[in-house]
Regions:
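Bacterial N-terminal signal peptides that target proteins for export
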Residues: 1-11
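Bacterial N-terminal signal peptides
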Residues: 9-19
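A structural boundary/capping signal
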Residues: 21-226
Length: 226
């Protein structure tokens, strides 16, 4: 198993450079509604950008989110289904898909373009679960070291209770499993709308200081106003 220390040091250094680690003031959390608040105008724009199938994908996605929100089922069933449904999006590296090395797509961009990488899957699952009623405190987008891939990776961790072992939603597998069963993943840091946690250090500041997150939120706001 690769040592965690070098990866953790690099992650902490990056967060320090971004101003995340430290006693930062809490920022307003992101409102619910981004995931299904897709207007006809936005669908038209993304159809022009990503092709005629974009509209079909976005309409189907909105229908699914609305119907799933009203459907009965256990918490675990919801996690399994959301993980499986969004994993159907094709995996595409950022450089090939967006022409950038590290681009965090909005859920509407990922769905309409039918392309995502690990961050994009995680972001889409996060916003969809939040819209379906999952409390923000239970959700953490989590950077890990993937032992299998030997590279950085992102997953969504779901905490049924504050002191509970998290369940892992991963684009690499449809099955949702407890973190203790994912020995192939070494956690580095995690965040949600409200806070950042660095492994072995605990709470470390506000996610608004993470550049890619701030850029993503700005694009989500523009989508909502379209």
């Amino acid at each position: 198993m690769p040592p965690i220390r070098p990866l953790l040091v690099l992650a902490c250094a990056a967060l320090l450079a971004a101003g995340v680690i430290g006693g930062l003031e809490a920022q307003p959390r992101v409102e619910r509604g981004f995931t299904t608040a897709v207007s006809d105008r936005l669908i038209e724009l993304y159809s022009q950008r990503f092709g005629p199938l974009a509209a079909e994908r976005l309409h189907a996605w909105k229908r699914y989110a609305r119907s799933r929100g009203a459907a009965p089922g256990s918490e675990r069933e919801l996690l399994e289904e959301v993980n499986r449904v969004l994993n159907r999006i094709a995996f595409v590296e950022d450089a090939a898909h967006w022409g950038e090395e590290d681009y965090w797509a909005t859920p509407a961009e990922s769905v309409s373009s039918n392309g995502a990488d690990c961050e994009d899957y995680t972001i889409a699952k996060y916003f969809l679960l939040k819209e379906l009623g999952a409390p923000i405190a239970r959700l953490r987008m989590t950077y890990v070291k993937s032992v299998k891939l030997n590279q950085a990776h992102m997953v969504l961790a779901y905490y049924p209770r504050p002191d509970a072992e998290p369940l892992v939603l991963d684009n690499l597998e449809d099955r949702v499993r407890p973190a203790s069963q994912r020995t192939d993943l070494i956690p580095v840091y995690s965040f949600n709308d409200e806070e950042v946690w660095v492994e072995m250090r605990g709470r470390s500041g506000s996610p608004t200081q993470i550049r890619n997150w701030s850029a993503l939120i700005a694009r989500l706001e523009r989508e909502r106003r379209t």
